[in-house]
Amino acid sequence: MVFGNEMCDETPHPGECKTLLIKHKPIRSTTQFLQVSVERTLDGAVKAKSDTYFLEPQFGSKQAWEECMDLYEQTIHRLNESVLCPKNVCSRSDVQAWLSTALTNLDTCQEEMSELGVSSHSLESITIDVINTLAINKRMEQNGKEFGISKITMKTLSIGEKVDVVVAQDGSGDYKTIQEAVNGAGERLKGSPRYVIHVKQGVYEEYVNVGIKSNNIMITGDGIGKTIITGDKSKGRGFSTYKSATFVAEGDGFVGRDITIRNTAGPENHQAVALRSNSDMSVFYRCSIEGYQDTLYVHSGRQFFRECDIYGTVDFIFGNAAAVLQNCRIFARNPPNGVNTITAQSRFNPNQTTGIVIHNSVVKGAPGVQLGGVKTYLGRPWRSYARTVVIGTYLDTLIEPNGWIDWDNVTALSTLYYGEYQNSGPGSGTENRVDWAGFHVISDIQEAREFTLPKFIDSASWLPPTKVPFTINL
């Protein structure tokens, strides 16, 4: 057990690490140490979910309780993937991404519980275990110890391939609603062929959920402004931010293209999500995502947005995914309080491989919107290790000279990472930017390359088969 003790001493919570491993046979290698840590963490997640099941009366909100139960299920799913990694020949970066997601799930649940005054020792315990396991895997990743190269292949639509089902409101397709088509696909394993749902032109007033067991689903429409999915759930109408989304993608390998997703609750109803994605290795291509506060919830996983339009006001690109927005147009609308914040990234552990990268895009006011008197910022830190980088992007006059704004969190100003690299436009000047320790005007090209697709979301292993165009360099 001496070897395990030494490894535990290098984790953020050594005492809990040693307690976790104390009943295990002697640890003889770093690989075995990681495997034991992940397995014990998985056991803890199963127990925490069971404990939370019996906490329903304390929640006082069935919606919040169901949200936590769902997040525990997703956490168990990600930890299972990590446990099976050696058998499936995946990479350390895969494991780090899945552990980052598990920790994000727990944080989302914790936030709901804190608002309701509910406490859970098992939630606190499993959070510490995931934090420790993240640190262990990060150390091994830095030392170059790999399980192998990912062999998961995402089979996808290319020109001329057959669409599986068609959705049409007039009855000319296989289904009249999108959710019926998703349900008709059934459970689909990772690595299964892409299941393609074509949604014909129309306004679909429904809430769509592509669940965690629905992997490799593609939903393709007839174009932005033609195939429209719309809803109006919001915080102001009694829904949590997490549950307010018009469209939810949870199954891995999701692809959405040529569709519009809207939340029409309006700025007076506060948080109102149009799209929430928890889908690892997900892609959105030529989509319009429209709302006001909290429009695009990049909750967790590795995500890529290409040639998308995103509309909003306050924190309208937010969450803790590893998300890259490339060749996108980001439109600020009129906010209710005179302040727009484009991003609110919520990385809260330095070992999480998460952040928001805006690359080769355009940030400007929405068409027809007058932003006189409105202050617009590139972002604010939702959590202490928030990470947002803007690269090669056109920033219009709406961006305030100081660029970024605080969230009443003085500590975060030194631990966050906000970066700008070779942007253009009247709002791109950095001479009057914030003087925080965590803000960087990036001058080193090697530092900037850390936020390219291959480095930041491990794109080489999964993005090319989607047939979506992308740029791998700066």
Swiss-Prot record:
Residues of the site described as Transition state stabilizer: 293
Keyword match Transferase: no
Annotated binding of substrate, by residue: 241, 271, 380, 382
Gene Ontology molecular function: any one: enzyme inhibitor activity
PROSITE patterns assigned to the protein according to its UniProt record, in alphabetical order: PECTINESTERASE_2
InterPro entries: Invertase/methylesterase_inhib, Pectin_lyas_fold, Pectin_lyase_fold/virulence, Pectinesterase_Asp_AS, Pectinesterase_cat, Pectinesterase_inhib_dom
Region span, Pectinesterase inhibitor 38: 1-130
Disulfide bonds: 308-328
Record flagged with keyword Disulfide bond: yes
EC class (word): hydrolase
Gene3D superfamilies: Invertase/pectin methylesterase inhibitor family protein, Single-stranded right-handed beta-helix, Pectin lyase-like
BP-aspect Gene Ontology terms: cell wall modification; pectin catabolic process
Signal peptide: none
Pathway assigned to this chain's UniProt record: Glycan metabolism; pectin degradation; 2-dehydro-3-deoxy-D-gluconate from pectin: step 1/5
Subcellular location(s) per record: Secreted, Cell wall
Reactions performed catalytically: [(1->4)-alpha-D-galacturonosyl methyl ester](n) + n H2O = [(1->4)-alpha-D-galacturonosyl](n) + n methanol + n H(+)
Positions of the UniProt region annotated as Pectinesterase 38: 164-461
Predominant location: secreted
UniProt keyword annotations, A-Z: Aspartyl esterase, Cell wall, Cell wall biogenesis/degradation, Disulfide bond, Glycoprotein, Hydrolase, Secreted
Active-site residues annotated for this sequence: 294 (proton donor), 315 (nucleophile)
Role: Acts in the modification of cell walls via demethylesterification of cell wall pectin.
Family affiliation: In the N-terminal section; belongs to the PMEI family.
NCBIfam families named in the record: PME_inhib
Other comment: The PMEI region may act as an autoinhibitory domain and prevent untimely PME activity during transport.
Protein name: Putative pectinesterase/pectinesterase inhibitor 38
Native source organism of the sequence: Arabidopsis thaliana (Mouse-ear cress)
Lineage: Eukaryota, Viridiplantae, Streptophyta, Embryophyta, Tracheophyta
